Design a protein with these regions (language model features):
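Nuclease catalytic cores that cleave nucleic-acid phosphodiester bonds
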Residues: 54-164
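Domain-level signal for Mg2+-assisted phosphodiester chemistry and nucleotide/NA-binding surfaces
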Residues: 1-90, 130, 138-139
Length: 164
């Protein structure tokens, strides 16, 4: 009898991923990225955490079509005068959903370079469920350096997931 396949879930901080990749000078193709996660890491479900902006409805539909399970966070306008910046910090949602889903997966991939996920990553490692931390670039939080053996930069497989 063959070994049973592990159930792998990815938990993606979309803003951290998108802005981190843009800071490296390229744009991510989310559909290619989803296919890469399935092919490389056997990701069964990819949860994409994103701030909800009504005018981006078609983007959300295309992400669903690409195979993401979208978890929305309500957004608020930034406090800086005249910035017009919209904020939708998804950290709490990502941690909460990774714990809600905890009994359903054998391994997790956290996609973010944000140090706010330190306690989640530490817990997943302790429970032998941390597979990878995929960071958008090399400027990830120093808090995550303790988990260096799990860290992979998106830049290493950029050619497979970039737009265009």
């Amino acid at each position: 009898m063959g070994k049973e396949k592990k159930v792998v879930y990815a938990f993606i901080d979309s803003q951290n991923l998108n802005l981190g990749v843009l800071a490296s000078g390229w744009r991510l193709d989310f559909a290619k990225f989803r296919k890469y996660l399935a092919a490389k890491y056997n990701v069964n479900k990819a949860f994409l955490f994103i701030g909800y902006i009504p005018k981006n409805h078609s983007l959300y539909e295309s992400l669903k079509q690409a195979g993401y399970k979208i978890i929305f966070k309500p957004t608020i306008r930034g406090k800086k005068k005249g910035s017009g910046e919209t904020k939708g910090n998804v950290d709490a949602e990502l941690v909460l959903h990774s714990m809600i889903e905890f009994p359903n997966y054998d391994g997790a991939i956290i996609i973010s370079g944000d140090g706010d996920f330190y306690c989640l990553v530490e817990y997943l490692e302790k429970k032998n469920k941390l597979l990878k931390i995929v960071v958008p670039n090399d400027k990830y939080s120093s808090l995550l350096r303790k988990f260096a053996q799990y860290i992979v930069s998106v830049n290493l497989f950029k050619d497979k997931v970039k737009r265009g």
